[in-house]
Amino acid sequence: MDAIQTRSLTKYYGKARGIIDLNLAVAEGEFFGFIGPNGAGKSTTIRTLLGLISPTGGSAEIFGRDIAREREAILQKTGYMPSEAMFYPGMRVRDVLKLSAGLRKSDCRREADKLCERLQLEPSRKVDELSFGNRKKVAIVCALQHRPDLLILDEPTSGLDPLMQREFFDILGERNKEGATVFLSSHVLSEIQRNCSRAAIIREGRIIACDSVDALSRDSTKRVTVHGHVPLEGLEGIRDRQDADGTVSFLYSGDMNRLLRAFADGQVSDLTVSEPDLEEVFLHYYETADGSREAVSEGSGSQTGSTGESGFGKTASVQKDCGKDGEEL
C-alpha cells in the first residue's frame, strides 16, 4: 500500500496557481524528499493532503483513505509539522503537548518526555517566552509524540542549531527504520541528499523531476574541472562556468566526444570529471531560458503563485508523474 497517492491533484486560489495535476506515489516506509523554493507549491501540496484546504480538482489518499471523506482517521496515523511554529500565548509547553495528544485521544506523556529530553526542551516553559528554535522543538514533539505511521514535515529544521538538526534527523531515521513513512519538504538540499531515498522537484505547481536521490544527482550532467587552457567557445552544454587562476570549472551536459576533442586541441595539465551534487542538479532544473537562475530562498511554499508559462527552456512544459522506483503513474 502507498502511504501517499495523488491523482491529478490540483489547487487554484481564484485564478492564481497553487498546484496543477500532481501525480505522486510515496511507498509505505519510504523516506521521501519534496524540493522547491518559495511559491513552488510545497506547502499547498501538504495542506491539501492533510485536508486543511480543499482541492480544486483531482484526488488523494493517505494509506488508502480519501483525504476528503476520511480526514479524521488519516490524522490519527499522521504527524504534521508546519513550517510555522505558532501556539496559543500563555500556555506552557507541557500544556501544548497535552492538547495535541488529546486531539488524537492518546496519552503520549512518556514519549513526549523522551523527546523533550533528547531535544533539550523544558516542558515547564511558556511557549511565548521561547525562541523560534525552541518553538520548532515544540512542533517536533507535537508531530512525533503519538508515534504516527506517516510524518509530513514542512521545512522542519529552520531555526534549529546544527546539533539539534542532527538529533532531529537521528530521531527521524530511527522512526523510519521502525517502519514510519517520512515526507520531508525542504529547500535544504543537503538534508534531502543525506536522508532521503527518493525525491521530487516541484516548480510553479508542477512536479518537474522525480527519481531516486542518486539518480537525480547523477542526471546526465558532469562537473568538469580543467587546469590549463582549453578552447571551449561554441561548445554547447556548458553551464555555471567559473574561471580562476588558470583553472576552469563548469557543469557539462553536452556531447562528451566533442568535449574530449576540445581537450585534445588545448593544453591540459590536470582534469577532473565528477558527479554533480544534488544542489547543482536542482539549480539546473530552476535555470531560466536566458541562463539566469531563479532565487531559491528559505521558508515555506507560498499559498499563491504566479500564473503563466514556465521559463526554463527545454523542460518548461514537462510535468512528471512521480511513481515508485521510477515507474510512471
Language-model region placement:
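Conserved ABC transporter NBD signature motif
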Residues: 58-69, 73-74
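Short, charged/small-residue-rich alpha-helical element at the C-terminal edge
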Residues: 222-289, 293, 297, 302, ...
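Catalytic Walker B motif of ABC-type/P-loop ATPase nucleotide-binding domains
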Residues: 151-155, 160
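ABC transporter nucleotide-binding domain
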Residues: 168-253
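Hydrophobic anchor residue at the start of the ABC signature
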Residues: 140
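Conserved ABC nucleotide-binding domain
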Residues: 109-129
